[in-house]
Amino acid sequence: MVNLFPVFTLIVIITILITTRELSTTMLIVSLVTDYIIINTQYTEQQHENNTFSMPQKNSFNESYNKDKKSNTHIPYQWLAPELKEAESKYWWGNYDPHSEPVLAGAS
C-alpha cells in the first residue's frame, strides 16, 4: 500500500505557497520541508544499515572459482602486429581521408 502522507503534505504546502504572498511564511514552509526530507533520508539510511548483515556471507563456490581462475591480462599480442600494420594501411582506421572517397551519382 502506498503511503499517502508525503503526497498530502506536498499538496498542502503547494496550496499554502499559492495562497500566501509573504516571504516569511514561504521560507518557513521551505525550511520545514527540507528538514522533513533530511530527517526522512537519514532515517532510511540508518534503517538500511541496520538491515544489512554485519558478517558477509561466505560462498565456497565463488572462493574456489576465484582461486582457480587464471589471470588472462598478460596475453602476448606480438603475433598480431603484422596484421594490424596491414589493416592500418588498408582500412579506415589507418589513413582515412573522407575527401578521397568517390562521390556517388545522385547523392545530395
Swiss-Prot record:
Q: Which UniProt keywords apply?
A: Glycoprotein, Late protein, Membrane, Transmembrane, Transmembrane helix, Virion
Q: What does the record note about the induction of this protein? A: Expressed in the late phase of the viral replicative cycle.
Q: Where are the transmembrane segments?
A: 10-32
Protein name (database record) = Inner membrane protein H108R
Asked if the record carries the keyword Transmembrane, the reply is: yes
Q: What residue spans carry the Polar residues bias annotation?
A: 49-64
Which cellular components does GO assign to this protein? membrane; virion membrane
Q: Which family does it belong to?
A: Belongs to the asfivirus H108R family.
Q: Where is this region: Disordered?
A: 49-69
Instruction: Please report the record's description of how this protein sits within the membrane.
Output: Single-pass membrane protein
